[in-house]
């Protein structure tokens, strides 16, 4: 699995009335995303269990190693 070397703010997104967000074309191209690609949304929660951040990961990158890292976080969400 590739590891990220750096993070930065790429775009400010707006949600429409249908709950959809649009990733800017330049970002989609840089990420190699195309129509029909699947993304996994990982939610980070604060001490009050309020979602404070979302991370999007290409579904094909969610391998067993990543699942083992995510699993403990999901226990708190799904019980």
Swiss-Prot record:
Enumerate the SUPFAM superfamilies for this protein.
AbrB/MazE/MraZ-like
Keyword RNA-binding present in the record's keywords: the answer is no
Q: Name one GO molecular function term.
A: DNA binding
Q: Pfam family example for this protein?
A: MazE_antitoxin
Q: Where is the SpoVT-AbrB domain?
A: 10-60
Matching NCBIfam families: lp_hng_hel_AbrB, near_HgcAB
UniProt name for this protein? Uncharacterized protein AF_0476
